[in-house]
């Protein structure tokens, strides 16, 4: 898709999903410490410049307010800068767009490819990061680059712990949202509430512990069968908590029965990556078939930790192909349990 079409089509979908048409960005928040404005009316004109100007080693939030506009270029939040907040100052999440357009196979100046992680429009390595009321996008145009076969194009890559995304849109095609950690066996928690995530192949993936609460998960129609896979978790075997979707909506423009809920990703054929995806108390559209889970190469989905609980909608089918949590298990696999950790983190109170 062309960039303008991509953003225009997606913006309406995200707003309908979250109902965020009239929520002022400043309500209930502290005043920004720095302001970014593409027209030069703020402290900086670019997102990265503002992040570079933020203090290192902070112990309380440092707020960067972003005025409406489209901000192009890769953004990196380094591990040395915890407690950063990017806050969109528009009335809707699509008023502020932070985007880049490279893919896995896009070549660097030295002739080597960027790779999947290197393709990310935004990389978050700083703990206690927060993003509010804005859009992250990877605008890589697959149709315009048939010469590139490795088309993974990440909008956001997370590697840190205790991250919050509130009323945020994530837009791309393959590999939109990469929720990861700094290393295998290291737990990194992410809380996403009232968000919108759009893509086609494995577009929510990684080994982080991530809770999606009241989110809309939208699968694009890429004109194939299967049309894609929503999740590709690579949860470490030592981590009891992977990807949790609760009170969310799974939607698509794709034909009925052509999108899978997920498949187990084993990076580098790691046998200890026993992915977990749980979908509970959510609405699932007809694009999800009876056999909702898929093998990933030689790795069978039955060996992963895939479960559902009390879902509704035409795609919420209870069968032998759709493992369900028991009531007792459902009491254990809650958002609070996923996010609590050893430090009793409660982001819903933030």
Cite the ranges covered by each PLM segment.
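Sequence-level preference for short, compositionally simple segments enriched
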Residues: 30-350
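N-terminal export signals
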Residues: 5-25
